[in-house]
A protein has these predicted regions:
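N-terminal strand-loop element at the rim of the active site
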Residues: 17, 40-87, 187
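Conserved acidic donor-binding segment of nucleotide-sugar-dependent glycosyltransferases
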Residues: 337-347, 355-361
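Nucleotide-activated donor-binding/catalytic signature segment of Leloir-type glycosyltransferases, i.e.
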Residues: 259-286, 292
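An aromatic- and histidine-rich active-site surface loop
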Residues: 56, 90-93, 110-131, 137-146, ...
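Membrane-proximal helix-turn-helix segments that form the acceptor-binding/catalytic region
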Residues: 35-37, 118-120, 125-129, 139-145, ...
Length: 411
């Protein structure tokens, strides 16, 4: 520690400042989450960051704009050919760590975002060093964890450089886990690995206009976020059309389903597709045209191992939220959320849409304001950073002085 503050080295995938707005399809939720978390942690600890960037950005860091990002001490690139660049990146990271440690001393904690090949390789090397920092996984997404992996996929990935497909085995490399997904607890605590649920927080502060209690007309629905099959956007749109409620559904975002949604909007007057907005933060002002935002996430394809970060931005709009409980969303929204059932989802969606469409607009406005207040109090990044530092400090107090935690074995 330095002056009583933890020294933290964080391995991230966040962009440098001024870059992200030119690459809206890359790291949509992860970048603002990682940036805001590092900023909040730096107010409580001495934080250094490393950034791993995608090949699409190489050579395109300029010109910069005013989009958020992190000033990394080291930039790494995941480029083709993968075998060479991943091997080179992990060697760069190891050299950076050794030089930084020799110059400034060993960090207390290494935070590692997800289970990427380069960071995995570095973690496996670091575990063999003595002494070493506490190695903590920040698990935002784990698509294969708890899933049966087909033999063909195992065979295909066996030839991909530095890839560890079995995420369950990779968990054993870490001394603790900070997880976005509430369902990952069972992979850590039975093995004696400290685990903390931290579903993230809101990234864009927004003050919605005062509620218009004189507004009349049908209840309007909306969705913003990723547009792919995993997010269940198409079943949501189809369920809305089948419900035949008097209002309209508005959608904006980016993803593979954009063209499909555009075509649907052309055929149905009650469905409007607004495409990709200029900046993620623009979605909050866009949402003022609706009364209720819908989160249709289902516990499929490993999504229950993560958290839909758009829930926090939904909350900041001051609008009511209709959502499944998947990933612990109900623990964030509380009693003011309106909930869908994941079993028999299609029928539940139609019934809830009809019920919400019949609700008094003032009641929906009250719910939205209550959700916003709850998120501002309990799910801001400063509060999450405080919880993380408390979690890490508690582990370090029980850690052997030599810096090597007790061995962790598979259950």
């Amino acid at each position: 520690m330095t002056n009583g503050r933890l020294r933290v080295l964080s391995l991230t995938y966040a962009f440098p400042p001024g870059v992200s707005s030119r690459f809206p399809s890359l790291n949509q939720a992860g970048h603002p989450n990682e940036t805001r978390l590092a900023e909040a942690l730096s107010r409580l600890a001495e934080v250094s960051t490393v950034g791993m960037l995608a090949r699409e950005i190489f050579g395109k860091l300029e010109p910069r704009d005013d989009s958020i990002g992190l000033e990394h001490e080291l930039l790494l690139w995941d480029r083709r050919p993968e075998l060479w660049h991943r091997w080179h990146s992990w060697r760069q990271l190891r050299r950076f760590y050794l030089e930084k440690t020799a110059r400034q001393g060993m960090p207390d904690v290494l935070l590692v975002k997800n289970l990427g090949p380069v960071y995995n390789c570095f973690v496996r090397w670091l575990r063999r060093q003595h002494p070493r920092p506490l190695i903590v996984l920040i698990l935002a997404d784990a698509g294969t964890l708890g899933q049966k992996i087909p033999f063909a996929k195992r065979l295909r990935f066996a030839f991909k450089p530095m890839i560890t497909l079995d995420e369950g085995k990779s968990m054993l490399w870490f001394d603790a886990c900070i997880s976005y997904g509430i369902g990952t607890r069972c992979y850590f605590e039975p093995r004696g690995v400290p685990w903390m649920w931290m579903p993230s927080a809101f990234n864009f502060r927004y003050n919605p206009p005062p509620a218009n209690f004189a507004q009349t007309g049908p209840i309007q629905f909306g969705y913003f976020g990723q547009l792919d099959e995993r997010t269940s956007v198409l079943p949501m749109v189809q369920g809305f059309l089948d419900a035949h409620v008097p209002g309209t559904l508005h959608v904006c975002g980016y993803g593979k389903l954009s063209n499909v949604l555009k075509e649907l909007a052309g055929r149905h007057s009650s469905f409007h597709f607004d495409g990709l907005l200029a900046k993620p933060s623009d979605c909050l002002a866009w949402a003022q045209k609706v009364d209720v935002l819908i989160n249709p996430r289902l516990p499929i394809q490993g999504l229950d191992n993560s958290f839909p970060s758009k829930i926090f931005e939904f909350g900041m709009t001051g609008k009511a939220v209709l959502s499944t409980r998947t990933c612990g969303v109900d623990q964030v929204l509380g009693d003011e959320g309106i909930y869908l059932e994941t079993k028999d989802f299609d029928n539940s969606l139609r019934q809830k849409l009809r019920a919400v469409a019949a609700m008094d607009r003032a009641e929906l406005q009250r719910r939205g304001e209550a959700i916003r207040g709850r998120i501002l109090r309990k799910f801001n990044w400063d509060e999450q950073a405080r919880r993380i530092i408390e979690f890490l400090t508690g582990i370090l107090k029980t850690r052997p002085a030599a810096g090597r935690p007790p061995a962790i074995h598979a259950a």
